[in-house]
Swiss-Prot record:
It is an enzyme of class 2 (transferase). Belongs to the IspD/TarI cytidylyltransferase family. IspD subfamily. Keywords: Isoprene biosynthesis, Nucleotidyltransferase, Transferase. The record marks 16, 23 as: Transition state stabilizer. Catalyzes the formation of 4-diphosphocytidyl-2-C-methyl-D-erythritol from CTP and 2-C-methyl-D-erythritol 4-phosphate (MEP). The keyword Nucleus does not apply. HAMAP family: IspD (MF_00108). This is 2-C-methyl-D-erythritol 4-phosphate cytidylyltransferase. It comes from Azobacteroides pseudotrichonymphae genomovar. CFP2. GO terms for biological process: isopentenyl diphosphate biosynthetic process, methylerythritol 4-phosphate pathway. It holds the Pfam family IspD. The record marks 152, 207 as: Positions MEP for the nucleophilic attack.
């Protein structure tokens, strides 16, 4: 398999969590969420290149946390941008061509090795891969014009890690000047470089953005 990288995006402020510190630094089973996330990729492959994207003001705090919790997993910390788009773009400057690169949310600490492995293996052939899960709740479209039920079988919840041949993702980010993207598959699709492939995600691969999410993660974590 090609050389592997993961860009872990963790520069958010976590306003929905209503906590005094950003959500990626909140404790989960006695240590910061972000450490669990990094450990998940290190367990998958101890040789993976881990690139951590933080805001400038968070880098010093992260360094102090690593010292406090004796966190020794090797990773490269870089400064994020004003939006997620520019944070990932900054991370890509540290990624070589002709490699495989994953982009993962820093607050998805419960990602399993099986999902990571499946995404990387599929990306070798499909070039751009994303995990997703079907919607099980009823779904409605509510706008100024419509208030109607829609067919939930046509919609999926998209997760990370999203994995790419590095050339594909680098070229997609270089080809667009818009930063109105919520994930990296959307950036690749906008450039019409390739057609992304969906793989089966996991319900336990939750994104921790609210206090309820944190409680669920506490119950699910090994």
């Amino acid at each position: 398999m090609k050389q592997k990288y993961v860009i872990i995006v963790a520069g958010g402020n976590g306003l929905r969590m209503k906590a005094t510190i950003p959500k990626q630094f909140l404790l989960l089973k006695g240590k910061p969420i972000l450490m669990h996330t990094i450990e998940a990729f290190y367990r998958y492959d101890t040789d993976i290149h881990i690139i951590l994207v933080l805001s400038e003001k968070q880098k010093t705090y992260w360094t102090s946390l690593c010292q406090q919790y004796n966190f020794k997993i090797d990773h490269h910390t870089i400064e994020g941008g004003i939006t997620r788009f520019y944070s990932v773009k900054n991370g890509l400057f540290s990624v070589k061509k002709n490699c495989l690169v994953a982009v993962h949310d820093g607050v998805r600490p419960l990602v399993r090795e099986k999902l990571i492995d499946n995404a990387f293996k599929m990306a070798q052939k499909a070039l751009a891969v994303y995990p997703a899960i079907p919607i099980t709740d009823s779904l409605r479209e509510i706008t100024n014009r419509n208030n109607r039920t829609v067919n939930r079988s046509e919609f999926y919840l998209v997760q990370t890690p999203q994995v790419f041949l590095s050339d594909i993702l680098i070229n997609a980010y270089e080809a667009t000047s818009s930063d109105n993207f919520t994930d990296d598959i959307s950036v690749v699709e906008s450039g019409k470089i390739c057609t992304p492939t969906m793989i089966k995600g996991s319900k336990s691969n939750i994104k921790i953005t609210t206090p309820i999410d944190l409680s669920i993660a506490e119950a699910l974590i090994d």
